[in-house]
């Protein structure tokens, strides 16, 4: 959003910290492991999945790829069906931000139904606004979802590693 003013004071410190957290996860390879897992899971669904047309090498391209919530909902529906749970509903053709926000909200509700704790979910704006700091919340959600899937012996397994950081700020 080009009309957004720059953060100052406490807001700036929070944004800086979230961006640093994302950078740390990126250095660990977490976003790459997440997108690899998503593609493997979706490709395992009888070949109905079209791989992304571009390399998802940076946070912005990954965020844009997931932005409308369609890929997230399709991905989650595969997890839910293998766990004998109801699929989430979503709009396949997103023509406005309201449909995207609804998709993202349905994804979060589906994650809770799958067994992910509510505190690991993210706000729809974290994904929709395509900003690096808030995108960390999306990565954290998907990373945690991977561990929930692993605890249910879902195949293909998520290869992410548990990382523990001491927050000193």
What spans do the regions from the language model cover?
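Alpha-helical coiled-coil scaffolding segments
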Residues: 1-169
